[in-house]
Amino acid sequence: MNKARKMYLIISIAIGGAIGATSRYIISTAIQNLSSNAFPYGMLACNVLGSLILGMLYDSLAKAGIFTDNIKAFIQIGILGSFTTFSAFSLEAFLMFEKGDHITAIVFILLSVLLSISGLVLGLNVLRLVF
């Protein structure tokens, strides 16, 4: 890959990252504000939703053949990579353990992993049925 193409790829990912991170903040905050509970529902929702969308797009982007590597990177790495929050998830779980909220932390970890993988599988299979 030449320098110009690589730079365009990096810029595509960066723009997608800005979109995904901003979307994550807006959606996560809105969902969290609906709850009086300290459980991180907003982050959980973003991780599951992002996994669902990635599952739906993963096959369709590959099969459609109309998307360039830059568009795939823009969506998958940029938007969805910054929309889902695994590093923030890890910190949130650690802080729960540190506060002594062991049960809440374990429930959060299990739900995050199981529902995110389920969302990915569901998204993949829904679009496989359609296309």
Spans of model-derived segments:
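Membrane-interface helix-loop junctions in multi-pass transporters/channels
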Residues: 1-131
